A protein has these predicted regions:
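Intrinsically disordered, low-complexity terminal and linker regions
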Residues: 1-114, 233-238
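Short coil/turn segments at secondary-structure boundaries
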Residues: 107-111, 162-165, 192-196
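Active-site and NAD+-binding cores of ADP-ribose-processing enzymes
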Residues: 1-2, 12-16, 20, 171-238
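Eukaryotic beta-rich interaction modules
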Residues: 72-78, 115-130, 156
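Core residues of folded domains in eukaryotic genome-function proteins
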Residues: 90-94, 120, 145-149, 175-179, ...
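Short proline/glycine-enriched turn/loop segments at secondary-structure junctions
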Residues: 165-171
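Extended catalytic/binding region for NAD+/ADP-ribose chemistry, centered on the ART fold
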Residues: 96-97, 124-126, 130-165, 181
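A conserved ligand/cofactor-binding region detector
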Residues: 90-93, 97-99, 104, 127-138, ...
Length: 238
């Protein structure tokens, strides 16, 4: 139900922009619920929300996202083993991506996106994701750097990845943010100890990095950046 409400809240306009959702706003409450209900018990106190912004994606961005969905569905229809979710909607999921914020967005009422390449949040919203979006220390440690865009099922893990990215940048002023995204997961490959085994395997659209105790995919690498559509920016308190 929460996911359906999120889809209804995503607006499309002629240029990319963001609008702050103030405290008490019904849309903000839904985003807060999404962040809170996704937390694991061990993460219960690590994410404190300071600001929430709604992303207004361009028609072109949304069209690219839908075109990718159709490509995934078409590819799935040609497989001998059918995957119902892939055939239905491309296996769409709601995921979090942690990123650093190097500009004044959210400070003193600022709501404009910056043009700096050093600001991961604004760069992603303006230009979309890239495979380098997965290059945090976690993906490097497990050998998956450069495999795809790193996403998580919990806001707490995404916040940790934003922390890792900030440590890499060595910028004490960088703030942490979460991007709440719709993603087309498509056909998901099970986790691999050696990611080199994955190279050259056709027919998969994403790679599971970590699977939880109930077979839920806690960490997921999207192989194609077009598979992600950022919907909300959640700026976290330090």
């Amino acid at each position: 139900m929460v996911f359906v409400l999120l889809l209804m809240m995503v607006m499309v306009c002629g240029w990319v922009s963001v609008t702050e959702l103030v405290e008490g706003d019904s849309s903000r409450k839904i985003v807060e619920i999404i962040c809170r209900t996704s937390l694991l018990k061990s993460e219960s106190s690590c994410v404190r929300i300071e600001r929430v912004f709604k992303v207004h994606n361009t028609q072109r961005t949304l069209a690219r996202f839908e075109e990718y969905r159709e490509a995934v569905k078409l590819k799935a229809s040609k497989l001998a083993k059918k995957h119902p979710r892939c055939l239905a909607d491309g296996n769409e999921l709601l995921r979090f991506h942690g990123a650093t914020l190097a500009c004044a967005l959210g400070s003193a009422g600022a709501s404009s996106l910056c043009a700096s390449d050093k600001c991961a949040v604004c760069r992603i919203i303006r230009h979309g994701f890239s495979s380098s979006s997965s290059s945090n220390s976690s993906s490097k440690k497990d050998g998956k750097a450069g495999v795809g865009v790193f996403t998580t099922s919990t806001s707490g893990r995404a916040f940790e990845s934003a922390d890792e990215a900030a440590d890499q940048q060595d910028d004490p002023a960088a703030r942490r943010a979460l991007l709440v995204c719709r993603v087309i997961a498509g056909r998901v490959h099970k986790p691999l100890e050696n990611v080199r085994e994955f190279v050259g395997q056709a027919g998969f659209d994403s790679l599971a990095g970590k699977v939880g105790p109930y077979a839920n995919i806690e960490e997921l690498y999207l192989l194609n950046p077009r598979a992600l559509l950022p919907c909300f920016v959640v700026i976290c308190k330090p």
